[in-house]
Each structure stands twice: as structure tokens, then as C-alpha cells.
Amino acid sequence: MRSKGVAMADNVISREPKYVGFWMRLFAFFIDSLILTVIIALILIAIFGRNYIQLSMQGKTLWADILFQVVLPALAAILFWRYRGATPGKMLISARIVDARTFGPPSTGKLVGRYFAYLASIIPLFLGFLWIAFDKRKQGWHDKLAGTVVINVEDED
């Protein structure tokens, strides 16, 4: 496989790639959020009917809320990262998550760590995500903690 300006061999990049910046990653996040919201809403309405919100406010859907709003998004993200290198939103913008040192696929452990490291990026007023806009390699704090970067793979053959 070859990429414009970046030599590829066994899914490892031999030269510095083009990193994906803040605005494109934010766009990908919104796409992923929209897809997940629709899927989760359809599942919850199928299970609880149209009065899901009322039942949720009464505390009658806690198990489903945790399963479908916490566990499902985590599993979906980690599985997409592991098997596709990106979530649907990142695939749409031709981006891929790779190991920051080798530019190859990150280990599953790194990907799980990356997901949970989102908390470090979120808690202090989303500063860990804003960091992407100013970082040389466009890494958020979750990327730095997990040892990953997000690169553009648009020109891959």
C-alpha cells in the first residue's frame, strides 16, 4: 500500500504523517454522536416504548441507561478502533488512530486506555480536547496518555 508522501509497509508509516486537527476531529465526533444517539434511541424506544423518557425520569430504566449509554458506546468505540482503526466519523474524514511511536495499529490495551483517558480530557473543562488545536502532533491528552495519534489516510491506495 502506498500513500501520497507517506510510505506504508505492513501498516507502519515510515515518515511523519499528516495529523488530523481539532476541527476535523470535532466534526467526526459529532457524526459518531449522531449515529450513536439514533441507534440508542431506537433501541430504548423498542424496549420501553415511547414513554422511555418518563420512565427514565422515574428511575425505572437505570440498567438500560447504563448499558446503552455507557457500556455500548465504550464497546462500539473500542471495537471500531481495534478492527477498523477509526469510528465511522473518523472513517468519513479519512482518519485513523495509530500508535504514536510506530504509526502501526495500537494494541487493544492502548485503545482501552485511550477510551478511559477521555476522562482526563473532559474533566478540566474539555481542555484535553482543546489541546489538540495547539499540539504539534495534534494529540489530545487522551492521545498522549494512551500513546496514540490520529492521522490522515485519505491518499491510501
Question: Where would I find each of the regions flagged by the language model?
Answer:
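Membrane-interfacial and juxtamembrane segments of integral membrane proteins
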Residues: 2-157
